Amino acid sequence: LNRPTSGSVIVDGKDLTKMSESELREERRSIGMIFQHFNLLSSRTVYGNVALPLELAGMPKDKIREKVMPLIELVGLSEHVNKYPSQLSGGQKQRVGIARALSSDPKILLSDEATSALDPETTQATLQLLKKINKELGLTIVMITHEMDVVKQICNRVVVMNKGVVVEEGDVLEVFRDPKNEVTQAMLGTALAARTIPASMVERVKKVLNTPGENGRKNHLIRLTFVGSSTTEPVLSRACSKFDLDFNILLGQVDEIQSESY
């Protein structure tokens, strides 16, 4: 909506900063937007809110209905088509916002903190809907969020920004597995907390590390990370047999990102 003071905004190979106002208006129609606080018109029903962009574009009423009803069905609100926003839950309001954003057949869908105002259960339902839209419509979705669990569940790639500067980017699995920037590490702190050895256990382990084992060998503390198919392979068992080792597992967890275990 606002032109940047410097740099470029390139969408689908086109630099938006070099377009005229008329060209920019046309290009905006190919970009849908989901807002954090829904931004629905209280005087319009579910149908009316979804139909609004099409009415503003001058589409005939019969064509609008042909377009709107399948979208309302897609987001699971067929039974609420004539209800007003005041009669809907937060999750239902967000679904209206999603349907409205899809009404203009966008190539890209921007989701600006779309789940931050929702409860955990509704958040999960909304994320599943967005994944469904991504797969069924082949639509690119750009998620703007500070919730790393949202990134983990729905995104393929991630870009981490700090004070307007990109500090890290890459495949979600790789960034979660090995974050390079301290900002990313801090953001992932909560998500990775379950993988951190408790402080009390660390002190006990330090004592063991300074004490030779029964075979006279020095004890070591090692963190192993398995990604993808390697999570199901008996790596520790093979190492024990091959190198005549004893081992004790202090902490372990299996997580999943985009159907990939790690």
Which residues does each PLM region occupy?
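ABC ATPase "signature
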Residues: 169-170, 178
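Conserved ABC ATPase signature
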Residues: 23, 84-88, 92
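A short, proline-enriched helix->beta-strand linker immediately N-terminal to the Walker B motif
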Residues: 103-107
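A short, surface-exposed alpha-helical micro-motif characterized by mixed small hydrophobic
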Residues: 151-153
